[in-house]
A protein has these predicted regions:
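Charge-dense, helix-prone N-terminal extensions
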Residues: 1-132
Protein backbone atom coordinates (compact mmCIF):
# COMPACT_ATOMS: atom_id res chain seq x y z
CA UNK A 1 0.00 0.00 0.00
CA UNK A 2 1.66 3.19 -1.16
CA UNK A 3 -1.13 5.59 -2.11
CA UNK A 4 -3.85 7.49 -0.35
CA UNK A 5 -6.38 6.00 -2.77
CA UNK A 6 -5.42 2.44 -1.77
CA UNK A 7 -5.70 3.27 1.93
CA UNK A 8 -9.04 5.03 1.52
CA UNK A 9 -10.42 2.19 -0.62
CA UNK A 10 -9.38 -0.35 2.02
CA UNK A 11 -10.98 1.72 4.79
CA UNK A 12 -14.16 2.15 2.77
CA UNK A 13 -14.40 -1.62 2.25
CA UNK A 14 -15.68 -1.95 5.84
CA UNK A 15 -19.44 -1.78 6.48
CA UNK A 16 -21.12 1.49 7.48
CA UNK A 17 -18.19 3.72 6.46
CA UNK A 18 -17.86 6.97 4.52
CA UNK A 19 -15.11 9.33 3.42
CA UNK A 20 -14.92 12.88 4.78
CA UNK A 21 -12.72 15.99 4.60
CA UNK A 22 -13.45 17.74 7.91
CA UNK A 23 -10.99 20.63 7.65
CA UNK A 24 -12.02 21.90 4.20
CA UNK A 25 -8.49 20.94 3.20
CA UNK A 26 -8.17 18.26 0.53
CA UNK A 27 -4.88 17.12 2.07
CA UNK A 28 -6.78 15.72 5.07
CA UNK A 29 -9.11 12.88 4.05
CA UNK A 30 -10.54 10.42 6.53
CA UNK A 31 -12.76 7.38 6.81
CA UNK A 32 -15.37 7.33 9.53
CA UNK A 33 -18.23 5.15 10.72
CA UNK A 34 -21.48 6.61 9.31
CA UNK A 35 -23.69 5.75 12.26
CA UNK A 36 -21.39 6.91 15.08
CA UNK A 37 -19.28 9.48 13.18
CA UNK A 38 -16.16 7.96 14.78
CA UNK A 39 -12.97 8.17 12.72
CA UNK A 40 -10.67 5.17 12.34
CA UNK A 41 -8.41 6.23 9.44
CA UNK A 42 -6.87 9.63 8.69
CA UNK A 43 -4.86 10.25 5.51
CA UNK A 44 -2.66 13.23 4.66
CA UNK A 45 0.57 14.12 2.87
CA UNK A 46 3.55 15.29 4.90
CA UNK A 47 7.20 15.61 3.87
CA UNK A 48 6.50 14.05 0.47
CA UNK A 49 4.85 10.89 1.83
CA UNK A 50 1.27 9.85 2.40
CA UNK A 51 0.69 9.26 6.11
CA UNK A 52 -2.07 7.29 7.79
CA UNK A 53 -3.23 7.81 11.35
CA UNK A 54 -4.87 4.77 12.95
CA UNK A 55 -6.17 4.05 16.43
CA UNK A 56 -4.18 1.40 18.26
CA UNK A 57 -4.49 -0.71 21.38
CA UNK A 58 -1.55 0.29 23.65
CA UNK A 59 0.00 -3.20 23.57
CA UNK A 60 -0.14 -3.39 19.77
CA UNK A 61 0.84 0.26 19.44
CA UNK A 62 4.16 -0.44 21.14
CA UNK A 63 4.72 -3.54 19.03
CA UNK A 64 4.06 -1.76 15.71
CA UNK A 65 6.21 1.24 16.67
CA UNK A 66 9.12 -0.98 17.64
CA UNK A 67 8.77 -3.24 14.59
CA UNK A 68 8.78 -0.45 11.98
CA UNK A 69 10.64 2.87 11.97
CA UNK A 70 7.86 4.28 9.77
CA UNK A 71 5.22 3.72 12.47
CA UNK A 72 5.38 6.60 14.93
CA UNK A 73 3.27 8.40 17.51
CA UNK A 74 0.08 9.82 15.99
CA UNK A 75 0.62 13.16 14.26
CA UNK A 76 -1.84 15.81 15.53
CA UNK A 77 -3.68 13.21 17.64
CA UNK A 78 -3.45 11.61 21.08
CA UNK A 79 -0.04 9.90 21.05
CA UNK A 80 -1.20 7.17 23.44
CA UNK A 81 -4.09 5.97 21.30
CA UNK A 82 -3.08 6.87 17.73
CA UNK A 83 -0.15 5.89 15.52
CA UNK A 84 1.06 7.33 12.23
CA UNK A 85 2.08 4.99 9.40
CA UNK A 86 4.36 6.65 6.84
CA UNK A 87 3.75 5.04 3.44
CA UNK A 88 7.40 4.98 2.38
CA UNK A 89 7.41 1.33 1.28
CA UNK A 90 9.03 -0.04 4.45
CA UNK A 91 5.85 -1.30 6.14
CA UNK A 92 4.38 -4.42 4.45
CA UNK A 93 0.81 -4.23 3.13
CA UNK A 94 -0.43 -6.94 5.48
CA UNK A 95 0.87 -5.01 8.51
CA UNK A 96 -0.79 -1.79 7.28
CA UNK A 97 -4.07 -3.64 6.71
CA UNK A 98 -3.84 -5.24 10.17
CA UNK A 99 -3.37 -1.80 11.77
CA UNK A 100 -6.32 -0.32 9.85
CA UNK A 101 -8.42 -3.36 10.79
CA UNK A 102 -7.50 -2.97 14.46
CA UNK A 103 -8.43 0.72 14.30
CA UNK A 104 -11.82 -0.10 12.77
CA UNK A 105 -12.51 -2.75 15.41
CA UNK A 106 -11.56 -0.37 18.22
CA UNK A 107 -14.03 2.32 17.16
CA UNK A 108 -16.88 -0.08 16.36
CA UNK A 109 -16.56 -2.27 19.45
CA UNK A 110 -18.18 -0.87 22.55
CA UNK A 111 -18.84 -2.61 25.87
CA UNK A 112 -22.21 -0.86 26.12
CA UNK A 113 -23.21 -2.17 22.70
CA UNK A 114 -22.07 -5.70 23.62
CA UNK A 115 -24.10 -5.63 26.85
CA UNK A 116 -27.16 -4.28 25.02
CA UNK A 117 -26.93 -7.02 22.37
CA UNK A 118 -26.50 -9.70 25.08
CA UNK A 119 -29.53 -8.45 27.02
CA UNK A 120 -31.65 -8.50 23.84
CA UNK A 121 -30.90 -12.24 23.54
CA UNK A 122 -32.30 -13.09 26.98
CA UNK A 123 -35.48 -15.10 26.37
CA UNK A 124 -38.73 -13.48 27.38
CA UNK A 125 -41.01 -16.28 28.49
CA UNK A 126 -44.76 -16.17 29.04
CA UNK A 127 -44.35 -17.91 32.39
CA UNK A 128 -42.30 -15.17 34.00
CA UNK A 129 -43.67 -14.48 37.43
CA UNK A 130 -43.32 -11.08 38.96
CA UNK A 131 -41.43 -10.98 42.20
CA UNK A 132 -43.27 -9.15 44.98
Amino acid sequence: MTTREEALAFGLSYPDTCQDAPFHDTNWQLVRIKSSKKVFLWTYEKDGYINLNVKADPEWRDYWRSAFVSVTAGYHLNKEHWSTIILDGTVPDDAIKNMIDESYRMVTDSPTKRIYEAVKKIPKGKDRKSVV
